[in-house]
């Protein structure tokens, strides 16, 4: 069982959160600084943690003024994105401002969620997407947002932590092939998710 699961007691009541909200936002901006990686010109991966998920839930609860019962339902949706100690989880966003260009681009990117990978030496770890809803339609159009899991074994965790190994994150879709090298700062930050 994932000991990092978020429960209702981890969420501050809205009245209290409103007082500290501005400071929490500043803290989270700093915390996320080395958790984002651009892969090509329009795709970005935002690597999640227990802290980022609590912040997102807290913000949603505050803005939408949801009830405790609704909050319990939201926890069921958010908890699968908390890394379990042997994985990295990420929200991948395809960010194109122009709506027409975005629609056209996404219509050619079906199945992209199955083509995202972390490369460590000769090892490739392909993402597994959240199964909550299909992110690609039968017509081949994909969503602009994907929730991804990269599963690691002990050997891959050690390889990830080893600073002598170059780590790349890529997408090898036929319509969008890009590879990015992660910095030592990003590696160091993401390695905190492994227990």
Where are these predicted regions, by residue range?
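Long, contiguous binding/interaction regions
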Residues: 1-87, 95-195
């Amino acid at each position: 069982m994932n000991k990092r699961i978020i429960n209702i007691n981890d969420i501050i009541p809205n009245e209290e959160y409103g007082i500290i909200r501005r400071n929490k936002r500043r803290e989270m901006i700093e915390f996320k600084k080395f958790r984002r990686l651009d892969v090509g010109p329009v795709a970005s991966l935002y690597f999640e943690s227990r802290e980022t998920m609590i912040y997102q839930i807290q913000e949603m609860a505050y803005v939408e003024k949801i009830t405790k019962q609704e909050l319990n339902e939201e926890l069921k949706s958010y908890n699968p994105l908390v890394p379990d100690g042997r994985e990295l989880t990420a929200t991948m966003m395809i960010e194109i401002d122009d709506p027409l260009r975005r629609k056209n681009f996404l219509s050619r990117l079906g199945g992209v969620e199955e083509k995202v990978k972390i490369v460590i030496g000769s090892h490739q770890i392909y993402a597994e997407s959240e199964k909550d809803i299909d992110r690609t339609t039968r017509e081949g159009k994909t969503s602009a947002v994907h929730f991804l899991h990269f599963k690691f074994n002990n050997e891959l965790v050690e390889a990830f932590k080893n600073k002598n190994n170059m780590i790349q994150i890529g997408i090898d879709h036929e319509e969008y092939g890009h590879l990015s090298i992660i910095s030592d700062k990003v590696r160091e930050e993401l390695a905190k998710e492994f227990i």
